[in-house]
Amino acid sequence: MNITIISVGKIKEKYLSDAINEYSKRISRYSKIDIIEVADEKTPENPSEVEKSKILEKEAERILKYLKKDSFLITLEILGKELTSESLAKKINDLSISGKSDITFIIGGSLGLSKNISEISDFKLSFSKMTFPHQLMRVILLEQVYRSFRIINGEPYHK
């Protein structure tokens, strides 16, 4: 299994970097894990719809450069499907059993993801209807991927 996380924006806070490194290390027992950061665009204070669209398209171009043709794409979107931890584990396990050994998760920047990226997504996943900072979302996603592997392998995990 190969897990790739493509995320818009850099992690600036040490405590988030530490958490990302810790969960990446834990996941590496079960799967190869790659985290790719693409640059985010500077967003003006009150961007117009045209400015938002241009920003999202520039970020989408950067994301597209890293997509593998045969990877199963899961985008993180507010309007995606909400899953329990057990359901996410089942989804990852089912993909693995069906021969999809490459899964790519995509986390957008402060404005989310462009329609172009959303349209090519194989599965739209929502963690909540609430908005989270994309840097924190990376930690939350990694924790849930780690938890999924623990569930898949019948290992105990914190409830």
Curated annotation (Swiss-Prot):
What terms describe the molecular function in GO for this protein? rRNA (pseudouridine-N3-)-methyltransferase activity
SUPFAM superfamilies, alphabetically? alpha/beta knot
Instruction: Identify the keywords attached in UniProt to this record, alphabetized.
Output: Cytoplasm, Methyltransferase, rRNA processing, S-adenosyl-L-methionine, Transferase
Subcellular localization(s) per the UniProt record? Cytoplasm
One of the record's GO cellular component terms: cytoplasm
Q: Which family does it belong to?
A: Belongs to the RNA methyltransferase RlmH family.
Protein name in the entry: Putative ribosomal RNA large subunit methyltransferase H
Top-level taxonomy: Archaea, Methanobacteriati, Methanobacteriota, Methanomada group, Methanococci
